[in-house]
């Protein structure tokens, strides 16, 4: 009988204060150039892989089992020593410390979902202007960065990142005009009308991989692709591009992203069509409408673009 096991701890809420600031290379499609990382927050998962813990499954032998509560404490304690500016670097640091501390762990996977805290805007003294507070922050509940880092041991005992996958999740964008969906296949089952100019509301997750995974991990972030910049590039394309479908839209975003960041080798999309249902239209101005949330089910669109 063959076995494949894993175990770990999920959604370990971790908030590190006064981490290393992030500074990234500016791009035309985004105002984002970095963040101070006064609060660097994430929900972190650790998943341990390998056969070292098989005895716990087959015979209840727990002598090698690192309790998942211990894993939670480990993540919190070791995060104090992390000195990098990126989520990917944080996950790699914690994963490497796990493998260094517990030699019987063969390999593992770390994943994280950013918990963004945005500096509150406060009056700038008597100048009449505004500034970012250095002590007050608003918890963001919208789109956020994500990352997955897989770590393994080499034959000579070195600990390496075998996979790094970065992302921006839970984007929700609506464009009130400048999108269409027409000339699609029609048959006896089709009831959807063609729309040459329609609102388009999409929920979107974007992921990407680097040709060199260490770009996302090393403290030097000059070639790092910030998830905020990816979100802004997607919004810039959506704003100016007349799309003929969601498929058309995500393909254009992907092409633009790969052209902007040659250090990326792949970009992927998972999109949902969440266009509102129309309730009422004004008799005097057809632009004035009332909508409501759509009923399920929702259309899903996926795309992966990889360089040759």
Q: Locations of the language-model features?
A:
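N-terminal intrinsically disordered, cationic/polar leader segments
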Residues: 1-308
């Amino acid at each position: 009988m063959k076995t494949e096991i894993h175990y770990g701890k999920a959604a370990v809420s971790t908030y590190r204060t006064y981490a290393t600031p992030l500074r990234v290379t500016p791009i035309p499609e985004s105002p984002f150039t970095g963040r101070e990382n006064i609060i660097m927050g994430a929900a972190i998962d650790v998943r341990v892989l390998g056969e070292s813990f098989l005895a716990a499954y087959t015979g209840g032998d727990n002598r090698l089992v690192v309790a998942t509560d211990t894993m939670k404490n480990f993540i919190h304690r070791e995060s104090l020593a992390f000195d990098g500016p990126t989520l990917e670097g944080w996950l790699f640091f914690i994963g490497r410390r796990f493998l260094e501390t517990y030699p019987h762990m063969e390999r593992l996977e770390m994943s994280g979902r950013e918990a963004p805290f945005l500096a509150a805007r406060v009056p700038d003294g008597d100048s009449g202007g505004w500034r970012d507070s250095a002590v007050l922050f608003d918890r963001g509940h919208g789109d956020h960065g994500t990352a997955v880092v897989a770590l393994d041991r080499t034959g000579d005992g070195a600990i390496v990142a075998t996979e790094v996958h970065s992302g921006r999740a839970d984007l929700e964008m609506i464009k009130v005009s400048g999108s269409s969906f027409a000339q699609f296949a029609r048959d006896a089952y089709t009831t959807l009308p063609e729309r040459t100019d329609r609102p388009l509301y999409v929920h979107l997750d974007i992921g990407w991989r680097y040709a060199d995974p260490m770009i996302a991990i090393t403290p030097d972030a000059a070639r790092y692709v910030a998830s905020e910049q990816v979100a802004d590039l997607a919004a810039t394309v959506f704003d100016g591009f007349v799309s003929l479908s969601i498929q058309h839209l995500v393909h254009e975003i992907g092409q633009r992203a790969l052209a902007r960041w040659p250090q990326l080798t792949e970009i992927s999309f998972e999109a949902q069509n969440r266009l509102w249902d129309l309730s009422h239209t004004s008799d005097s101005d057809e632009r004035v409408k009332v909508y409501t949330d759509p009923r399920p089910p929702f259309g899903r669109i996926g795309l992966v673009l990889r360089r040759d």
